[in-house]
Regions:
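Short, low-complexity, Pro/Ser/Thr/Gly-rich segments in the mature regions of secreted, periplasmic
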Residues: 251-270
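The tetratricopeptide repeat
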Residues: 33, 68, 75, 137-150
Length: 270
């Protein structure tokens, strides 16, 4: 490609920028120079190096800045398993599949570390609430929530072979621990709260329709609990709802068939 696409720039500027964005920054010094360096590390998928620059070389003031936090969140997202362009491209290419399978399938054959998605989301929360962040930032948060769910399900439920094959290998009702299902609950909450910032052109019409459907179904069953992003607020009924959704064939990666009747979802896990 003639112009190198920068991952973080793409993430927060909706694919409108290339390397020329940083031309003038390359001549700057101090914190701005370190920001530029960290940006380059993220573009090269050297996430630990980017994190090291942001957390050890920037001044305290710069570390608390929006740009530094965006880069830091992108770095942790990368460690979780997210390549923004690759992931959204795979979502856009999905023509079929249930909601949770759509989220999980891009991580088949990929090493995943869901805990770093949690750290990335915590970092974005430091920038501000959903109401105070920009649309682009909220779109990134929604994607991080989706990636948290996808990496969690692939890592916790699709365990054979070692990097998964797209099918669940554990009993989704009892074989996924509370701590593990909490990743799915929290990821769902972030996706749900920020989903309006995502366009169908970014994630594809089928993925958009499918994910919107599972958001609506969860809201019908559990109301505002489907937007929980604080682990301390998670209750047993919320975990049950998410387990039920994941166990269904229509929304999840399980075998329980509802025939399209959402009233049957709560019976997926007895």
């Amino acid at each position: 490609m003639k112009n190198k696409i920068f991952i973080v720039s793409v993430t927060f500027l909706l694919f409108s920028c290339n390397g020329n964005l940083f031309t003038e920054l390359s001549s700057k010094t101090g914190d701005e120079d370190y920001i530029f360096l960290a940006q380059k590390y993220v573009d090269q998928m050297q996430y630990d190096s980017a994190i090291n620059v942001i957390t050890t070389q920037l001044s305290a003031v710069a570390q608390n800045g929006v740009k530094a936090r965006e880069i830091l969140a992108s770095s942790y997202g990368g460690k979780c398993g997210l390549n923004f362009i690759d992931y959204t491209g795979k979502l856009a290419a999905q023509a079929t599949g249930s909601s949770f399978y759509i989220l999980m399938s891009p991580f088949i054959g990929v090493v995943v570390q869901p805990q770093f998605c949690r750290t990335a989301l915590d970092t974005m929360e430091l920038i501000g609430t959903t109401e105070s962040r920009t649309v682009n930032q909220n779109a990134f948060v929604a994607v991080l929530g989706m990636v948290l769910m996808g990496t969690a399900l692939r890592g916790y439920a699709d365990i054979a072979p070692a990097l998964g094959d797209g099918t669940a290998d554990v009993d989704l009702c009892v074989g996924v621990t509370n701590a593990q299902i909490d990743d799915v609950v929290i990821g769902f909450g972030y996706m749900s709260k920020n989903f309006s910032a995502l366009s169908s052109s970014l994630i594809g019409g089928n993925s958009s329709t499918s994910l919107n459907a599972v958001i609506n179904s969860c809201s019908t069953i559990a109301g505002s609990s489907c937007q929980i992003t604080d682990e301390a607020a998670i209750t047993a009924p919320v975990r049950d709802t998410v387990r039920d959704l994941v166990q269904t064939a229509e929304y999840g990666i399980g075998t329980y068939a509802t025939g399209g009747n959402d009233l049957l979802v709560p019976g997926a896990c007895p």
